[in-house]
């Protein structure tokens, strides 16, 4: 299908979300993996330390309205103010150098940076294609390879 979607469950249940405009991202993969079970265990430990209890109400699986509004508006600045990842703090505990990558990206001009999923890939939201190219160039100076991607894009299509 392509486009923008909201993933729930294990990310396998997708529902389309309206997104206008173009969002440019710089993805910074890592040579070293990060175990998803380890990140979730760290998240549980962090929540336990904060006093979260097993019988607390479950976290909402709904996408916050500001995120959906930002996608509909096509405004990367607005999106940068509302994106977050519940797993990021746990991932950064396991791999603190990912925070350095995020900060380098923001210093290079990215609007915002987050850990993608349970990591270790870092996703840097940029204001424009030119901004993304500048971020890539400055990250390269620090020995970090990256990919410039944009969305939303259509899914696979048969051309014949």
Residue ranges and their predicted role:
Residues 39-41, 127, 136-137:
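Short amphipathic alpha-helical segments
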Residues 2, 7-112, 148-160:
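Conserved, helical-rich catalytic subdomain that frames metal- and/or nucleotide-binding sites
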Residues 114-115, 124:
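Conserved SAM-binding loop
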Residues 130-160:
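RNase H-like, two-metal
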Residues 29, 123-127:
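Short hydrophobic/aromatic beta-strand micro-patches
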């Amino acid at each position: 299908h392509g486009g923008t979607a909201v993933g729930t469950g294990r990310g396998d249940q997708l529902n389309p979300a309206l997104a206008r405009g173009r969002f440019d991202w710089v993805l910074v993969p890592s040579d070293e993996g990060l175990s998803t079970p380890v990140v979730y265990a760290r998240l549980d430990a962090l929540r336990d330390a904060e006093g979260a209890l097993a019988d607390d109400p479950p976290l909402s699986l709904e996408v916050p309205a500001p995120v959906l509004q930002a996608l509909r508006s096509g405004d990367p600045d607005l999106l940068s103010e509302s994106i977050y990842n519940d797993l990021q703090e746990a991932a950064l505990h396991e791999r603190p150098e990912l925070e350095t990558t995020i900060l380098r990206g923001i210093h290079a001009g990215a609007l915002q940076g987050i850990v993608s999923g349970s990591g270790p890939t870092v996703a840097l939201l940029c204001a424009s294609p030119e901004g993304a190219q500048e971020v890539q160039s400055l990250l390269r100076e620090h020995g970090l390879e990256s990919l410039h991607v944009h969305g939303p894009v259509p899914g696979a299509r048969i051309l014949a």
